[in-house]
């Protein structure tokens, strides 16, 4: 055991150092979500149903770091945690291979295969759940193999019971009485799987190879027929009890205690999470199989993963018969593992490399054992180890350079775009961006918290008509508060996924570009083109209220610009502008402004009215946003329904002084069934 611990202590720090030296500065959507959650949310809101433990773990790490004087985001803390877990996982895998093959070369090459795999390496330098989960899975794999080979000890004897005609006990069997019992191994397996499930819910799938390991443990030295079922039940309980306590206890505590669900329907809806959306899963067709090939290749290496994967499969094919001499349980446990995880993720999302990390340890275990089979002193075959060496050595520079490129913020289009958008916006402005990581880059990197996307709108509402209304409400809220709105051209008309790539969120939701563009059609007259920078995606802009006040004013033939109306109903008119049917005390109130009285000499307004009432009034809102007769200007409308331009002299107007935080226009004093159309309003210097 000391030998294996030495291998672990040698390998783990090497790969942990490699990961720490290659930490990414370009994050995935999920990674930024975790970082922002840990940085900003209270601990009660950190329990994601699909990876229940990761948010609280991050919060605990950040809290401990703050106590030691750490300042800033949890970003690097969480990355360092993943890097250390990744290194420990590689070291543990190397120790397992040394235990099974008795070859240090096999252990070293297996460690290099796992540690240099693109998916494993990338998620060891990112803020994601998969590396920590993989550590528990590797430890669980070790226990499953131990359990499959561990016989029951006979009371009063130092060695295991040997069935009549059976082989002599191996050295591992002879120490069974001194080592862990089958029940202890089963309990350890249940505990490790429970922890893996808390870091990613899909690791409930490990129960299938786990049950195979339990069955093999029973078969290693079958108990007497009369006690067989009792022994099986005891072993199953030893495994299931910690698994149930860890997983069931955690979910019940969070769901019923922390989150406060008061019905089982709500609780199970929360636990099911993404599975209820319909965006993932579905029939396995040719397109999914093509994405499967892409996902598996990129899991191993990017680029060149397909070629290296074929080389590894060749090692398996050429030496598969030799796997028959592998330690008991290796084939049945690993093949069950690969079949179950593979079937689920082919159905769920085959192109996503993060989901294939869980299948790397059993796959590489088979490959290494095929290249380094137990030989009983016979010389090793040469082709397998040589091909394995070439493959492993090729993965290191290929994936290392790819990860460094991907993690370089200066090469990241989304980071460059976020920085450029910050230069064209204020912190309170609303930014509607294409689906993807940009909606998180903006709040995290450039302090633009009001960033939303089509995907966010659909999640908030559940259906496209409601999502469209939600988007318009957010736009109106921003404009009414005096802020600008920036809308990506690709958000107005979402681009389809490139050939061979996974469908976009809009495509998953069944939304075509024309349908989305129709939602933004009412805004088109008011949109102003904006180019954030050379070579960057195009945007459109709805200017902020202050910008319009200091510039061209408000053209109501193009939009409402955040002005609010009270005491009037919408109307129709053949004349251009904002048509209203006045009721009692009709008013139009501007967004918040900061007007300098000395800067403007007149207020010009063009409007038409066919009402009997012809008295109009404009108020200059005080520092509290309140209107007062003493801070207003009255005038009478010209006779007739035609539109007229009125120029009001502000130089001697009552209240046109001091702090002015907005305008209120009363186009007429009261309604009488007629219509008022306000065409435009501006402040003249």
Locate each region found by the language model:
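Transmembrane alpha-helical segments
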Residues: 370-371, 383-410, 453-455
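Transmembrane alpha-helix segments characteristic
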Residues: 10-14, 109-110, 310-315, 321-346
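Membrane-lumen/periplasm interface segments of specific transmembrane helices
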Residues: 233-290, 301-302, 306, 443
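Transmembrane-helix motifs of polytopic, lipid-linked glycan transferases
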Residues: 80-101, 139, 143, 319
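Perimembrane helix-loop-helix junctions
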Residues: 143-154, 205-244, 365
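Short periplasmic/luminal acceptor-recognition loop of GT-C membrane glycosyltransferases, typified by
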Residues: 425-457, 484-491
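Hydrophobic/aromatic-rich transmembrane helices and adjacent perimembrane loops
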Residues: 124, 131-134, 205, 332, ...
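Membrane-interface alpha helices of multi-pass inner-membrane proteins
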Residues: 110-111, 185-200, 342
């Amino acid at each position: 055991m000391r030998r294996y611990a030495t291998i672990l202590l040698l390998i783990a720090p090497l790969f942990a150092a490699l990961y720490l030296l290659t930490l990414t500065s370009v994050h995935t959507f999920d990674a930024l979500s975790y970082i922002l959650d840990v940085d900003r949310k209270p601990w009660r809101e950190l329990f994601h149903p699909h990876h229940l433990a990761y948010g609280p773990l991050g919060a605990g790490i950040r809290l401990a770091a703050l106590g030691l004087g750490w300042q800033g985001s949890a970003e690097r803390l969480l990355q360092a945690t993943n890097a250390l877990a990744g290194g420990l996982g590689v070291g543990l895998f190397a120790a397992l291979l040394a235990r099974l093959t008795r070859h240090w070369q096999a252990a070293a090459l297996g460690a290099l295969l796992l540690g240099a795999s693109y998916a494993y390496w990338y998620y060891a330098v990112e803020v994601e759940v998969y590396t920590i989960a993989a550590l528990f899975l590797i430890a669980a794999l070790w226990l499953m193999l131990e359990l499959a080979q561990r016989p029951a000890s006979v009371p009063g004897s130092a060695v295991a019971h040997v069935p009549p005609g059976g082989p002599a006990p191996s050295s591992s069997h002879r120490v069974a009485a001194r080592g862990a019992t089958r029940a202890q191994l089963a309990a350890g397996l249940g505990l490790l799987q429970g922890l893996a499930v808390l870091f990613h819910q899909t690791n409930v799938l490990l129960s299938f190879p786990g049950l195979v390991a339990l069955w093999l443990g029973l078969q290693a030295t079958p108990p007497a027929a009369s006690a067989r079922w009792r022994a099986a039940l005891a072993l199953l309980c030893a495994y299931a009890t910690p698994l149930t306590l860890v997983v069931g206890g955690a979910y019940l505590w969070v769901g019923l205690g922390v989150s406060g669900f008061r019905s089982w329907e709500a609780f199970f809806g929360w636990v099911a999470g993404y599975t209820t959306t319909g965006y993932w899963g579905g029939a396995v067709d040719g397109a999914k199989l093509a994405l499967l090939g892409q996902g598996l290749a990129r899991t191993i290496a990017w680029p060149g993963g397909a070629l290296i994967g074929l080389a590894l499969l060749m090692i398996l094919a050429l030496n598969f018969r030799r796997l028959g001499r592998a330690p008991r349980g290796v084939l049945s446990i690993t093949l069950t593992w690969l079949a179950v995880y593979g079937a689920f993720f082919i159905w769920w999302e085959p192109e996503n490399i993060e989901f294939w990390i869980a299948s790397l340890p059993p796959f590489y275990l088979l490959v290494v054992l095929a290249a380094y089979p137990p030989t009983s002193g016979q010389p090793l075959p040469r082709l397998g180890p040589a091909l394995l060496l070439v493959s492993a050595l090729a993965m290191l520079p290929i994936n290392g350079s790819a990860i460094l490129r991907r993690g370089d913020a200066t090469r990241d289009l989304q980071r460059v775009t976020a920085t450029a958008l910050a230069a064209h916006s204020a912190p309170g402005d609303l930014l509607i961006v294409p689906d993807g990581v940009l909606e998180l880059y903006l709040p995290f990197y450039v302090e633009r918290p009001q960033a939303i996307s089509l995907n966010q709108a659909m999640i908030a509402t559940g259906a496209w008509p409601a999502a469209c209304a939600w988007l318009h409400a957010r736009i109106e809220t921003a404009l009414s508060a005096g802020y600008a709105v920036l809308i990506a051209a690709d958000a107005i008309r979402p681009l389809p996924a490139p050939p061979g790539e996974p469908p976009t969120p809009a495509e998953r939701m069944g939304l075509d570009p024309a349908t989305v563009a129709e939602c933004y059609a009412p805004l088109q007259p008011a949109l102003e083109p904006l180019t954030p920078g050379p070579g960057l995606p195009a945007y459109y802009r709805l200017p902020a209220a202050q910008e319009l006040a200091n510039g061209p004013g408000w053209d109501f033939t193009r939009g409402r610009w955040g002005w609010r109306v009270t005491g009037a109903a919408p109307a129709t008119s053949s004349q251009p502008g904002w048509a209203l049917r006045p009721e009692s005390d009709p008013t139009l109130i501007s967004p918040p402004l900061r007007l300098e009285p000395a800067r403007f000499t007149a207020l010009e307004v063009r409007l038409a009215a066919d009402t009997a009432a012809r008295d109009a009034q404009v108020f200059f809102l005080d520092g509290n946003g309140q209107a007062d007769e003493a801070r207003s200007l009255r005038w009478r409308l010209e006779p007739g329904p035609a539109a007229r331009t009125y120029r009001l002299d502000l130089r001697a107007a009552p209240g046109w002084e001091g702090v002015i935080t907005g305008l209120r226009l009363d186009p007429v004093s009261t309604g009488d069934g007629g219509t008022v159309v306000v065409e435009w309003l501006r402040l003249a210097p």
